[in-house]
A protein has these predicted regions:
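Acidic, Ser/Pro/Thr-rich low-complexity regulatory regions
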Residues: 2-259
Length: 259
Protein backbone atom coordinates (compact mmCIF):
# COMPACT_ATOMS: atom_id res chain seq x y z
CA UNK A 1 0.00 0.00 0.00
CA UNK A 2 1.52 3.37 -0.97
CA UNK A 3 1.94 6.15 1.54
CA UNK A 4 -1.11 8.43 1.44
CA UNK A 5 -0.47 12.08 2.42
CA UNK A 6 -3.64 14.10 2.28
CA UNK A 7 -4.00 13.15 -1.39
CA UNK A 8 -0.29 13.70 -1.93
CA UNK A 9 -0.02 17.21 -0.40
CA UNK A 10 1.57 17.82 2.98
CA UNK A 11 2.86 21.21 4.09
CA UNK A 12 6.51 21.49 5.11
CA UNK A 13 5.39 22.66 8.54
CA UNK A 14 3.43 19.42 8.99
CA UNK A 15 6.42 17.37 7.88
CA UNK A 16 8.61 19.16 10.42
CA UNK A 17 6.12 18.45 13.21
CA UNK A 18 5.90 14.78 12.19
CA UNK A 19 9.70 14.47 12.30
CA UNK A 20 9.80 16.19 15.70
CA UNK A 21 7.28 13.78 17.23
CA UNK A 22 9.01 10.77 15.66
CA UNK A 23 12.36 11.71 17.19
CA UNK A 24 10.89 12.62 20.57
CA UNK A 25 8.96 9.35 20.84
CA UNK A 26 11.98 7.35 19.70
CA UNK A 27 14.14 9.03 22.35
CA UNK A 28 11.70 7.85 25.03
CA UNK A 29 11.85 4.33 23.59
CA UNK A 30 15.65 4.28 23.44
CA UNK A 31 16.43 6.00 26.74
CA UNK A 32 13.51 4.87 28.90
CA UNK A 33 12.51 1.59 27.23
CA UNK A 34 9.11 3.08 26.35
CA UNK A 35 8.75 1.24 23.04
CA UNK A 36 5.00 1.75 23.09
CA UNK A 37 5.75 5.35 22.13
CA UNK A 38 6.85 4.10 18.71
CA UNK A 39 3.45 2.42 18.38
CA UNK A 40 1.84 5.68 19.51
CA UNK A 41 3.67 7.45 16.70
CA UNK A 42 1.93 5.18 14.19
CA UNK A 43 -1.42 5.91 15.81
CA UNK A 44 -0.66 9.62 15.59
CA UNK A 45 0.03 9.27 11.86
CA UNK A 46 -3.25 7.46 11.30
CA UNK A 47 -5.08 10.22 13.18
CA UNK A 48 -3.47 12.65 10.73
CA UNK A 49 -4.76 10.52 7.80
CA UNK A 50 -1.22 9.43 6.90
CA UNK A 51 -1.38 5.76 5.95
CA UNK A 52 0.78 2.93 4.65
CA UNK A 53 1.03 -0.80 5.19
CA UNK A 54 3.99 -0.35 7.54
CA UNK A 55 2.11 2.26 9.58
CA UNK A 56 -0.88 -0.07 10.01
CA UNK A 57 1.37 -2.94 11.06
CA UNK A 58 3.26 -0.76 13.56
CA UNK A 59 0.02 0.60 15.01
CA UNK A 60 -1.22 -2.95 15.67
CA UNK A 61 1.85 -4.28 17.49
CA UNK A 62 1.92 -5.15 21.18
CA UNK A 63 3.99 -2.74 23.26
CA UNK A 64 6.40 -5.51 24.35
CA UNK A 65 7.12 -6.74 20.81
CA UNK A 66 10.44 -4.92 20.69
CA UNK A 67 11.94 -6.54 17.60
CA UNK A 68 8.97 -5.88 15.35
CA UNK A 69 8.39 -2.41 16.79
CA UNK A 70 11.98 -1.51 15.99
CA UNK A 71 11.71 -3.04 12.50
CA UNK A 72 8.48 -1.34 11.46
CA UNK A 73 9.19 1.97 13.17
CA UNK A 74 12.30 2.41 11.04
CA UNK A 75 10.40 1.20 7.99
CA UNK A 76 7.90 3.99 8.63
CA UNK A 77 10.55 6.66 9.25
CA UNK A 78 12.30 5.61 6.04
CA UNK A 79 9.03 6.09 4.15
CA UNK A 80 8.73 9.52 5.71
CA UNK A 81 12.38 10.26 4.87
CA UNK A 82 13.18 10.94 8.53
CA UNK A 83 16.89 10.35 9.20
CA UNK A 84 19.44 10.67 12.02
CA UNK A 85 17.11 9.33 14.69
CA UNK A 86 19.91 9.11 17.29
CA UNK A 87 21.16 12.65 16.70
CA UNK A 88 20.45 15.00 19.64
CA UNK A 89 18.64 12.18 21.42
CA UNK A 90 19.03 13.76 24.87
CA UNK A 91 17.59 17.04 23.61
CA UNK A 92 14.73 15.20 21.92
CA UNK A 93 13.97 13.40 25.17
CA UNK A 94 13.84 16.70 27.05
CA UNK A 95 11.36 17.94 24.42
CA UNK A 96 9.37 14.72 24.84
CA UNK A 97 9.09 15.26 28.58
CA UNK A 98 8.16 18.89 28.04
CA UNK A 99 5.30 17.84 25.76
CA UNK A 100 4.08 15.16 28.15
CA UNK A 101 4.16 17.45 31.19
CA UNK A 102 2.55 20.35 29.30
CA UNK A 103 -0.29 18.05 28.20
CA UNK A 104 -0.65 16.71 31.77
CA UNK A 105 0.15 13.19 30.55
CA UNK A 106 2.75 12.76 33.29
CA UNK A 107 3.11 14.53 36.63
CA UNK A 108 5.75 17.21 37.04
CA UNK A 109 7.32 15.50 40.08
CA UNK A 110 7.68 12.28 38.10
CA UNK A 111 9.39 14.22 35.30
CA UNK A 112 11.81 15.65 37.88
CA UNK A 113 12.70 12.13 39.04
CA UNK A 114 13.39 11.06 35.46
CA UNK A 115 15.57 14.10 34.75
CA UNK A 116 17.61 13.55 37.91
CA UNK A 117 18.43 10.04 36.69
CA UNK A 118 19.23 11.25 33.19
CA UNK A 119 22.52 12.77 34.32
CA UNK A 120 23.82 9.44 35.61
CA UNK A 121 22.42 7.56 32.61
CA UNK A 122 23.84 9.83 29.91
CA UNK A 123 26.69 11.79 31.59
CA UNK A 124 25.25 14.82 29.82
CA UNK A 125 26.34 17.78 31.96
CA UNK A 126 23.19 19.65 30.95
CA UNK A 127 21.22 17.38 33.29
CA UNK A 128 23.42 17.98 36.36
CA UNK A 129 21.36 20.98 37.39
CA UNK A 130 18.36 18.67 37.77
CA UNK A 131 20.29 16.72 40.40
CA UNK A 132 20.96 19.96 42.29
CA UNK A 133 17.37 21.08 41.84
CA UNK A 134 16.17 17.72 43.17
CA UNK A 135 18.27 18.32 46.30
CA UNK A 136 16.56 21.70 46.72
CA UNK A 137 13.15 20.02 46.42
CA UNK A 138 14.17 17.52 49.12
CA UNK A 139 15.10 20.43 51.39
CA UNK A 140 11.75 22.04 50.64
CA UNK A 141 10.00 18.92 51.92
CA UNK A 142 11.90 19.45 55.19
CA UNK A 143 10.72 23.07 55.35
CA UNK A 144 14.01 24.55 54.13
CA UNK A 145 14.02 27.02 51.23
CA UNK A 146 17.14 26.97 49.05
CA UNK A 147 18.32 30.47 48.13
CA UNK A 148 18.87 29.84 44.39
CA UNK A 149 15.32 28.72 43.56
CA UNK A 150 12.09 30.67 43.92
CA UNK A 151 10.07 27.61 44.89
CA UNK A 152 7.54 26.67 47.52
CA UNK A 153 5.16 23.76 47.96
CA UNK A 154 2.35 25.63 46.21
CA UNK A 155 4.22 26.60 43.03
CA UNK A 156 6.51 23.56 42.70
CA UNK A 157 4.66 21.71 39.93
CA UNK A 158 4.18 24.82 37.79
CA UNK A 159 7.81 25.74 38.44
CA UNK A 160 9.02 22.35 37.16
CA UNK A 161 6.86 22.65 34.03
CA UNK A 162 8.31 26.07 33.27
CA UNK A 163 11.84 24.91 34.10
CA UNK A 164 11.64 22.10 31.53
CA UNK A 165 10.49 24.50 28.81
CA UNK A 166 13.26 26.97 29.66
CA UNK A 167 15.86 24.20 29.62
CA UNK A 168 14.67 23.20 26.15
CA UNK A 169 15.31 26.79 25.01
CA UNK A 170 18.74 26.82 26.68
CA UNK A 171 19.89 23.33 25.71
CA UNK A 172 21.55 24.28 22.43
CA UNK A 173 22.76 27.70 23.55
CA UNK A 174 26.47 28.30 24.01
CA UNK A 175 26.28 29.14 27.69
CA UNK A 176 29.09 30.86 29.60
CA UNK A 177 31.31 28.72 31.81
CA UNK A 178 29.80 28.28 35.28
CA UNK A 179 26.46 29.54 33.94
CA UNK A 180 24.45 27.92 36.73
CA UNK A 181 26.62 29.67 39.35
CA UNK A 182 25.99 33.05 37.75
CA UNK A 183 23.42 35.64 38.76
CA UNK A 184 22.17 39.05 37.72
CA UNK A 185 23.04 41.73 40.27
CA UNK A 186 19.96 43.74 41.24
CA UNK A 187 22.00 46.94 41.55
CA UNK A 188 24.36 47.05 38.55
CA UNK A 189 22.33 44.62 36.38
CA UNK A 190 25.49 42.76 35.34
CA UNK A 191 25.72 39.00 34.94
CA UNK A 192 28.31 37.94 37.52
CA UNK A 193 29.51 35.06 39.64
CA UNK A 194 28.84 36.49 43.11
CA UNK A 195 31.64 36.25 45.65
CA UNK A 196 30.95 34.57 48.97
CA UNK A 197 31.80 36.56 52.08
CA UNK A 198 31.56 35.64 55.75
CA UNK A 199 30.44 37.74 58.67
CA UNK A 200 32.93 38.74 61.36
CA UNK A 201 32.32 35.69 63.52
CA UNK A 202 32.14 33.41 60.47
CA UNK A 203 28.73 32.02 61.44
CA UNK A 204 26.93 33.32 58.37
CA UNK A 205 27.84 33.99 54.76
CA UNK A 206 26.47 36.41 52.20
CA UNK A 207 26.98 37.17 48.53
CA UNK A 208 28.71 40.21 47.12
CA UNK A 209 28.72 41.42 43.51
CA UNK A 210 32.25 41.20 42.09
CA UNK A 211 31.49 44.11 39.77
CA UNK A 212 29.85 46.85 41.86
CA UNK A 213 30.69 45.27 45.27
CA UNK A 214 27.07 45.61 46.40
CA UNK A 215 25.52 43.01 48.68
CA UNK A 216 22.16 43.37 47.00
CA UNK A 217 19.83 40.60 45.90
CA UNK A 218 20.73 38.37 42.98
CA UNK A 219 18.64 36.74 40.30
CA UNK A 220 20.30 33.35 39.87
CA UNK A 221 20.66 31.72 36.45
CA UNK A 222 19.73 28.39 37.99
CA UNK A 223 16.30 29.88 38.76
CA UNK A 224 13.55 30.23 36.17
CA UNK A 225 13.50 34.02 36.48
CA UNK A 226 17.24 34.24 35.84
CA UNK A 227 16.98 31.96 32.82
CA UNK A 228 14.17 34.03 31.34
CA UNK A 229 16.16 37.24 31.82
CA UNK A 230 19.23 35.64 30.25
CA UNK A 231 17.24 34.57 27.18
CA UNK A 232 15.59 37.99 26.91
CA UNK A 233 18.98 39.74 26.92
CA UNK A 234 20.57 37.15 24.65
CA UNK A 235 17.85 37.56 22.04
CA UNK A 236 17.50 41.33 22.31
CA UNK A 237 18.97 43.15 19.27
CA UNK A 238 19.63 46.22 21.44
CA UNK A 239 21.76 44.47 24.07
CA UNK A 240 25.54 44.10 23.93
CA UNK A 241 25.09 40.95 25.95
CA UNK A 242 28.63 39.63 26.09
CA UNK A 243 29.88 42.93 27.49
CA UNK A 244 27.50 42.56 30.42
CA UNK A 245 29.11 39.38 31.73
CA UNK A 246 31.54 39.70 34.61
CA UNK A 247 33.09 36.30 35.21
CA UNK A 248 35.42 35.72 38.15
CA UNK A 249 36.20 32.50 40.04
CA UNK A 250 33.82 31.65 42.83
CA UNK A 251 34.73 29.97 46.10
CA UNK A 252 32.26 27.21 46.76
CA UNK A 253 29.81 27.61 49.64
CA UNK A 254 30.54 24.29 51.26
CA UNK A 255 34.29 24.91 51.21
CA UNK A 256 33.76 28.27 52.92
CA UNK A 257 31.52 26.75 55.56
CA UNK A 258 34.01 24.02 56.35
CA UNK A 259 36.75 26.51 57.27
Amino acid sequence: MPLVWYEGKVLKLELKEIEKIAKENYSAAKLQNKWYECVNFALYLLDEKIESENIYILAGLDSDDYDNINKYFFAVTNELKIVKMDEDINYNFLCYLGRKVHNDEIEAIYALTILEKMYYQTNDKRFWEWVEFGNAVDLLEDGITYYEYDINKDNLCDYIKEKILLDIDLYKEQLPDNFFKMAFCEKCKKLVIPEIKKTLFRKKFFYKCNNCKATSKFLWCSDNKGKKLYLERKNSPNTRFNADIVDKPQIQVRRMLDK
